[in-house]
């Protein structure tokens, strides 16, 4: 009976379904993170060896087919997220977690710097039990570094991922708002400018 209820829920609201997409190639896995504005987070992951593809979008919300304007209204519950396709033989998931923690302040609720709103929350959205376990272990280890501050990162199963509008994709690599392209070359460690 319980199974019937959950399937009818997912039929009426696809946003609540798990992310059932498949990576583009065999042997690749998905990872999904939220760490504030997705532009800089995406560029950081683009530079990682073993990351084959990145895309920014909206996840963990309750509205089907959201857009940027809607999620900024604060009514959809979505996070600005990045979905990564990676080769775990080249780049272990634990490496992605390390970069995730280094890219933002996981102790600020629903904000990163001047960006404020639930869409800027911190989250790790896992695709399998191994990712869930590694995410929890990494949070426990990271919490020891923040002795007097509580980490507010949510760790949840990945819900349906809605790809953001095309102008958001690889935004900083394409030049951002100021037309200053930033390198997405593997291994690049140039500072990331948030708006281009």
From Swiss-Prot:
Q: Known PANTHER family for this protein?
A: MITOCHONDRIAL PEPTIDE METHIONINE SULFOXIDE REDUCTASE (PTHR42799), PEPTIDE-METHIONINE (S)-S-OXIDE REDUCTASE (PTHR42799:SF18)
Q: Where is the composition biased (Polar residues)?
A: 1-14
Superkingdom of origin? Eukaryota
| Top EC class of this enzyme | oxidoreductase
Which keywords does UniProt give here? Oxidoreductase
Q: What Enzyme Commission number(s) apply to this enzyme?
A: 1.8.4.11
Q: Name one GO molecular function term.
A: L-methionine-(S)-S-oxide reductase activity
Chain intervals for the UniProt region annotation (Disordered): 1-23
- Which family does the record assign? Belongs to the MsrA Met sulfoxide reductase family.
Task: State the function annotated in the UniProt record.
Answer: Has an important function as a repair enzyme for proteins that have been inactivated by oxidation. Catalyzes the reversible oxidation-reduction of methionine sulfoxide in proteins to methionine.
Give the GO terms filed under biological process for this record: cellular response to oxidative stress
* Record's keyword annotation contains Oxidoreductase: yes
Gene3D superfamilies named among the record's database cross-references: Peptide methionine sulphoxide reductase MsrA
Q: What GO cellular component term, any one, is given?
A: cytoplasm
Q: List the protein's name.
A: Peptide methionine sulfoxide reductase
Reaction it catalyzes: L-methionyl-[protein] + [thioredoxin]-disulfide + H2O = L-methionyl-(S)-S-oxide-[protein] + [thioredoxin]-dithiol; [thioredoxin]-disulfide + L-methionine + H2O = L-methionine (S)-S-oxide + [thioredoxin]-dithiol
Against Pfam families, the record matches this protein to: PMSR
């Amino acid at each position: 009976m319980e199974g019937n209820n959950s399937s009818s829920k997912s039929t009426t609201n696809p946003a609540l379904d798990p992310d059932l997409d498949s990576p583009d190639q065999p042997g690749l896995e998905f990872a999904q993170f939220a760490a504030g504005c997705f532009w800089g987070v995406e560029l950081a992951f683009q530079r990682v060896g073993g990351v084959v593809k990145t895309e920014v979008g909206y996840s963990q919300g309750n509205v089907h087919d959201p857009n940027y304007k809607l999620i900024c209204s604060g009514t959809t519950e979505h996070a600005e997220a990045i979905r990564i396709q990676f080769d775990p033989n080249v780049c272990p998931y634990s490496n992605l977690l390390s970069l995730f923690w280094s890219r933002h302040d996981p102790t600020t609720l629903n904000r990163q710097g001047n960006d404020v709103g639930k869409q800027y929350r911190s989250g790790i959205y896992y695709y399998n039990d191994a990712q869930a376990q590694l995410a929890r272990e990494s949070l426990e280890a990271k919490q020891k570094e923040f002795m007097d501050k509580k980490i507010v990162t949510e760790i949840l199963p990945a819900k349906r991922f809605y790809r953001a509008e095309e102008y958001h994709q690889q935004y900083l690599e394409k030049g951002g708002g100021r037309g200053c392209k930033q390198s997405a070359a593997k291994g690049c460690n140039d500072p990331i400018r948030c708006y281009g």
